[in-house]
């Protein structure tokens, strides 16, 4: 205790260190508090478009995690290096294990200073929650946990790095190492990881995960549905650096001691670091706003992975047990209506690793797998009525973990009969994949939170008949409107009342195709070119409201034709350079042909012709073939006028 008092006295008398602490504490409190006042006085402002504002307030506060890391690394390094040179502490360094005790005392004092500097940020979150009357009761605990992890544990890891650096290298080298750690830990090195994979196919995603000790608010806005990722493996990454730093410091302090002393000092910290390392890099699901390397679907998929094979059987029912923990763990029993087939092709997202495939008696079934495509062979009796699969894994886009879940019914997180394209490389987005006909579902959910679905729920079990079972949780609530269940994020840019107004404005439920369906407002993903809104037999999922009518039309269009729909939607944007666009001769003929058709028929007639083609399932032509053939049938004078850029 005497040593702690002496060490604290030494810290408090150091003007440089105290000035840094006071400036950081006062400025961060004033700036974050001022932003909170701005949000409260402008709550509900359509210009801001941030809805409740709670997540944005938290996001702003967490931006100080990088500043806190740098400030306390500097404070820690200067304190560790100056204290051991202080004449008043020479008596402790001369005693047995004195230097080790001194460093532990310094660490304890610095950790206490970090904690004291964090308390105002926690209080600000509590005050904002109370004054703002935030609609989600559990949010305050989440916000305080984020403050603790990113504004206390992250700077504390910086203090530990500073401790190791003060023993390991001279001042300039130490500061360079600490600066490098801060930059890599902030997430700004993402471009480096992406370049490494694009150029050399070096996957650094696990290295990146180990360095992700700060919130994504440094680069991205928070997800209204998920908030910020606050998972065990991220906390383990922070403790990895703490444990590793202590192991390095312990080794340097006792390197001249006998082996037993060195082992006793280094081994516990080293084992803790290894345990945290393993926990960090093991596969885990999270909500990611940027993914690089082989785990990114944009990098994984190529055009030769796109397959379409109709199944000769139908799934008549599913009995599923889904556990959301570190990742999705699933046990699925799929009843099939054709028991005598030789093989049963199905689609299951490649990120889910299969543990076993059996029949209804538990006998193993032979199977082959190629990415998303799984083929299960019939049992020896040739009469297969049920296929049971056990698998575990995750998607880098559609998360399913102990914090929240987002599994739209259009995504094959459950086995779907036949081979279907999961991800379109042409349009950089996920396709709509559902069952050919509705099946009876029973889904038992094991999760530490409430889950919403288009199926009926009773005691954690969802059941009902559907072609696409959607599962969604997070900062979610629901209400009834015109016989439909509306599921939305309480932190979305629109409030409950504003959602009702917007739905009424566009007469959403006046459309007979949408009337009575459950509506799920869903998170945006990195690849939402094709999944802005999907309409199913009993529900629809959408990232917004105004886009639903257009998306309802778009999803009826086959992928091979969607390019024409994109051009028509943005015709004014593309029209100016139709005739000057670069590309192959076919591309140029396509753009020139579309321009000629618009000039000859007029915009309204062109859209009518194109709409008929887009919705005609029997017409197997691509959009390019359709436009070139139709333009080729125009009078030669009209074609020539179009090529010359002349209107009618």
Please provide the spans of the model-predicted regions:
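Extended, low-hydrophobicity, Ser/Thr/Pro/Gly-biased non-transmembrane segments
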Residues: 392-467
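Solvent-exposed beta-hairpin/edge-strand motifs
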Residues: 343-364, 416, 440-452
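Hydrophobic alpha-helical transmembrane segments
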Residues: 1-83, 254-269, 277, 488-494
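Juxtacatalytic substrate-recognition/specificity segment
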Residues: 477-571, 575-577, 581-582
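A surface-exposed beta-strand-loop module
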Residues: 350-406, 505
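Secretory targeting signals
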Residues: 44-68, 78, 104-171
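N-terminal, polar/Ser/Thr-rich
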Residues: 137-138, 193-240, 259-327
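Helix-loop-helix units of permease transmembrane domains in multi-pass membrane transporters
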Residues: 75-115
